[in-house]
Amino acid sequence: MIIEICATTINSIINANRAGANRIELCSNYSVGGLTPSIEYVKEALSISEIPINVLIRPRPGNFVYNDNEIDKMKKDIISIMDLGVNGFVVGSIKSNGEIDDEFINDVRALTNPLDLTFHRAFDYLSSQTRSIDKLIKSGFSRILCSGNENDAIEGITNLISLNRYSNNKIVIMPGGGVNKENCLEFKNAGFKEIHLSGILKNNSPIILDSDYNTIKEVVYKTK
C-alpha cells in the first residue's frame, strides 16, 4: 500500500523518509487545511527527501471556488515550482455551481505534463462526483484525495468504496482525513491502494506539527 504523508515541517519530511513512507504531500499552514508552500521550503524539502514530493497548490483558506486572479496565482506558483524537481502537484478548483472546474484541470494538465497530478479534497464538495471522476480520468490525473463527503475518511468509507468501484482502476481513490494507525488497515482491507495522513500526534498540547516517526512506521508496517 502507498503511504502519502502530509508534511508541513522539515522534521515531518525526515520522519516520513526514515519511517518508510512512499510519498510526501508538501504544504504549509496545516491548521487551515494546507496552503501552497514557499519556494524556499520546496527547495529545502527536495534537498533532503529521497521519496517523491507532490506540492499542494492552494492560494488561501476557505472554499475552493476561485476568481480569475486566484486561478492565475495558482498557475504562476506551479510554473515557479515545476522545474525544481518535484514529482507532481496537488490541485483543485470548483465552479460556483458545484461542478468541477474543467478549464482549470485541463490547463494544469497541459502546463505540468507529464508530472503526477492529484485532485485534492475539494472533490468532497463537488455536486457530481462520478461525472468529475470521468473528467479527471480524461484529463490524465493520477488520483483523487477525498474523505467520502465526511469529515473523516473512516466515516465516509462506504462512499469511498463506491467511488473506488466506479473508478474501475482508471484513477486512484486515496482516502484522507482522519486516517491513522488505528484505522489504516480498514482501508487496505476495503481494497484501497493508497492512503493519505499527517501522522501528527493530536493529543499533544500544544500540538507539535511534526509527522510522528513511530506513527508512520506503524502505519507502514500494518499496511504492508
What are these model-predicted stretches?
Residues I24-L35, S80, L84-S96, F141-I154, ...:
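Glycine-rich phosphate-binding active-site loops on the catalytic face of alpha/beta enzymes
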Residues I10-S12, L35, V42-I48, P52-D102:
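Active-site beta->alpha loop and helix N-cap motifs at the rims of alpha/beta catalytic domains
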Residues G34-P61, I100-A122, E155-N180, S211-K224:
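Alpha-helix-loop-beta-strand connector modules within alpha/beta enzyme cores
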Residues M1-T9, I57-K75, T118-S128, I173-M174:
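Active-site mouth loops of central-metabolism enzymes
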Residues I3-A7, I24-L26, I53-I57, F89-V91, ...:
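Hydrophobic faces of well-ordered beta-strands that scaffold small-molecule active sites
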Residues N11-R18, V65-D77, D124-S139, L163-S167, ...:
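Catalytic cores of alpha/beta
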Residues M82-S132:
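Hydrophobic, well-structured mid-protein blocks that either form specific transmembrane helices
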Residues A19-I24, S49-P52, G85-G88, L111-L115, ...:
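Glycine-enriched alpha-helix->loop->beta-strand junction motifs that scaffold or abut catalytic
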